[in-house]
Structure formats: structure tokens, C-alpha cells
Design a protein with these regions (language model features):
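Conserved alpha/beta cores of soluble small-molecule-handling proteins
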Residues: 1-124
Length: 124
């Protein structure tokens, strides 16, 4: 059996924790392919998450904490997965969030994706 996960802040997420996120929409994400439990360009993904968090929430979580959350999700499943890391406000989109509301992290893994086998051509 292959285990894929949905983790919130480094631990398995419950349906109750995920429900507000499904309807809030106040979030940003990055998606990556994990091969052999490694990610190419992880530093670029972390940079993207950091800058987008500052733009959206006025603050960012430490890279080490986000990296720990990613590592926990990757360790819980197969060595090759597709991974999406979503940074969101637990207060939601339609509420006034104070400066003390810290963004949270949802990490979801799924089956590894493979790109196209041959060259691509753009249609005009």
C-alpha cells in the first residue's frame, strides 16, 4: 500500500482542520516533484513561498520550519511523489486578521507525475 499524506504544520491534518481552508481561498502555494526524497531547486521553492507570504500576509514562516514540514510529509510516503505546499491564513479571506495571526502550512503528497516523453510544440 502506498501512503500519501495531507499534513498541517508538520502533522497529519484532520477534516475539521482542512474544511476552513477549502472555503477560505486566502493562500498561495508551490508544487514540486520529489524523486528519491529529494527536490531540485528546493531553495527556489522556499524563496517563492517566503516572498509570497510577505506579500500576502506581511510576514513569512522561517525556511527551516517550512523545510521541516516538507520533510515530515516526504518521510511519511514513498520516495517519489508530487508535493504541493500551501501557505494560508487560518483566519480566512473574509475576516480581519491581526498581525498576530501566523500563516499555517498544508503539505499534500500524491502520485509522482512524469513529464511528456517527447518534445512539445506550441500551436498558434
Amino acid at each position: 500500500m502506498t501512503d500519501f499524506v495531507a499534513h498541517r504544520n508538520g502533522r497529519p491534518a484532520t477534516a475539521e482542520e482542512l474544511a476552513p481552508l477549502a472555503f477560505a481561498g486566502y493562500a498561495h502555494f508551490t508544487a514540486m516533484q520529489v524523486r528519491g526524497r529529494r527536490v531540485r531547486g528546493l531553495d527556489l521553492h522556499l524563496e517563492r513561498l517566503r516572498y509570497a507570504s510577505i506579500e500576502l500576509f506581511g510576514r513569512a514562516l522561517p525556511d527551516d520550519r517550512v523545510r521541516d514540514y516538507l520533510r515530515a510529509a516526504v518521510a511519511a510516503g514513498p520516495a517519489d511523489v508530487s508535493l504541493t505546499a500551501t501557505i494560508y491564513s487560518p483566519a480566512g479571506e473574509f475576516t480581519v486578521a491581526g498581525a498576530d495571526v501566523e500563516p499555517e502550512v498544508l503539505v499534500r503528497t500524491g502520485p509522482a507525475a512524469s513529464g511528456p516523453t517527447g518534445p512539445l510544440a506550441l500551436a498558434t
